[in-house]
Amino acid sequence: MDIKLINIGFGNIVSGNRVISIVSPESAPIKRIISEARDRAQLIDATYGRRTRAVIVTDSGHVVLSAIQPETVAHRFMSNKDTKDSDK
């Protein structure tokens, strides 16, 4: 099993193998997920004080906040996956 690392901005990296979803923080259910993760001490704020633009949910229940667009994170995720596939 290869480890996929995804850059989520400002030098922060998450394991692509653990990502369940990448979503926008605008909706009430996502805001509730963020609040619950904060209460459980499973929220990772990687925005460096900037506006949250993407919320990354992992299989361990951690929630990661990123200051880059969800589409950008998804593109990096897919391009990293394509690079790994072409190496085989």
UniProtKB/Swiss-Prot annotation:
Q: Which organism is it from?
A: Acaryochloris marina (strain MBIC 11017)
Q: What Pfam families does the database record attribute to this sequence?
A: RemA-like
- By what name is this protein known? Putative regulatory protein AM1_5498
Source taxon at top rank: Bacteria
Do you know which NCBIfam families this protein is assigned to? MtxBflmRegRemA, PRK04323.1
* InterPro entries, A to Z: RemA-like
> According to its UniProt record, which protein family does this protein belong to?
Belongs to the RemA family.
